[in-house]
Amino acid sequence: MRAVLLTLACATALTAGCSRESAPAPAAPAAHPAAAVQTPSRSHDESSYAEPDKVVIKDLALDLAVDFDQKILSGTATYALEWKDKAAKQLVLDTRDLSVEKVEGQAASGAWAPLTFQLATADKVFGSKLSIDSPEQNKLVRITYKTSPTASGLQWLEPAMTEGKQLPFMFSQSQAIHARSWVPLQDTPSVRFTYSAHVTSRPDVMVLMSADNDPAAPRDGDYSFKMPQPIPSYLLAIAAGDLNFKAIGARSGVWAEPAMVDRAAKEFEDTEKMIDVAEALYGPYRWGRYDMLVLPPSFPFGGMENPRLTFATPTVITGDKSLVSLIAHELAHSWSGNLVTNASWKDIWLNEGFTTYVQDRITESLYGKEMAEMERQIDQTELLAEVKDMAPADQALALPPLNNRDPDESLSQVAYVKGAWFLKFLEERFGRETFDPFLRSWFDDHAFQSATTDQFVAYMKKNLLPKAPNAVTEAELNAWLNEPGIPKFAMKAQSRGFSNTDTARIAWLGSGQLPNAQVTNEWVTQQWVNFIGGMGDKLSVEQLAQLDKAYHFTGTPNGEIAMRWYPLTIRSGYLEARPEIAKFIERVGRRKLIMPIYAELVKTPDGLAFAEESFARAKPGYHPITTASVEALLARAKAGQTP
């Protein structure tokens, strides 16, 4: 998952299908859920109730119906289980706001019989523990259930909230722990399973999943999917809407609403080249196809690396490819994250730091070293600003146990930028001729597995450090992994491409003379970001008006510029921007782009009132994850806790 040019943390199933007919259950009283019990403590993974040391899901089959009227998914989930502990008698799953109708187990005879289950009292962060009694250690268990209309991992959009405004839209966001809100699962990245699915819907929408989507499949309301590679639960994904497909290359293409699909295909036309670059560096792409789905602007993140079907925000479609590093990032996850996965969310840097580093390498290869350097410098500058307000423990790559913290809220730029900076440090110390083969071997040796920071450190000490024994000290490794902040010996990115923007800004601030249009016409998004970002805390209204007249920042369709320009106007009292600010935060639900604007607004009473009014209008179109973030910010502001 990636927020391009990140400034705030972004933080996004099934065997050959379960049979619609089953053998009659033996004569016995129907099992009913026991009374709700208190939420028990969690072990193994602080964010999951699952007990994978006792029993693990190996394959999952979904048979679901999409109901746009009720805004629910309903049906069955069938689990193929591997029992590891011969004494275990329970299957424990994670759920959130699910209605469980019944649970059945298949006996050795093939007959299905009801199983007793208990659904614990819900925890506000982790949901409800579902305990299923299985005294015979059933190899197949089936749950009949339905989701809530307010499931945190699903968003339902009315036609008016889509590009085409004709058909409704639904999509999921399972990372970090939202898969449990639409499928009962061992919702931990330490468990991987293959899956298949049968999904029915209204016949005028196309349904897609993080699986083998067929571009030629008829739009008939009846769809089947299969994912033969094992994935963790957070990569389970589904979407349904008015979607068309356009091929980009032999194994890549774009799904989008009809009005968007051509623009998206043009913007992402280098995707096949990106795959080639990544394969040359880190080995074969192991997921078959790499397709992308462009979602409505309410999608709360920049992208989500769902295997075979990356979910992407339309806010990166600028017409000049200046933000396609998002696709490089999500593609890079095909090695770092999807192939080798953090074992728990406290090790998230193994996903996001590695991916940001691989993204930089792809960007450098296709768009030049200068582009990669500009993006690194922006990321590093913003990380250094962010850590000033962070607790020291949160600034380490190797995080302490999250305990009761929501992993969505514990994610910061540290995992992305400090993680990538650390790998860049290793690359510089050992040289690419040594570091590139090492990183490839890490991916190869841990393919389709989950890993911890301790495992990576042990692997590095065995396979990298001996190649140049004096290149890195234990103290330096400890500074990167376990100490707060950025080590003083870290080399900072320095982009030559920012020299003109810095010079132009300094000259304008001193003389009021804007740079020549022939110069600024050549600037890419990253240079405009640097130009605005160096303006300081405030400008005069007259200065902002001059910039606006020349560059039309107010009302810009470029989210990376908007998220920096609008906070500057708010701090400076430039009220002329307010109408466009309202339009922007009511149209876009991507947290990275709108949270800095809300955070600036709530610092004053009139700004807080404006934010509340805008949010009230925007909320029906926001994703539940975005809604929760804004509501928490507004609540803190009203309590006197301004950002």
Model-assigned labels for residue ranges:
Residues D85-A87, Q106-A113, E136-N138, P215-D222, ...:
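Short, glycine- and charge-enriched coil/turn segments that flank and shape catalytic ligand pockets
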Residues G153, T434-F435, Y574-P579:
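Short, solvent-exposed secondary-structure capping/transition elements
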Residues S412-V414, K418-G419, H446-T452, L464-P643:
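Long, ordered, helix-rich scaffold segments
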Residues S48-V56, A61-A65, D69-K71, T78-A80, ...:
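Mature, folded catalytic cores of secreted/periplasmic enzymes
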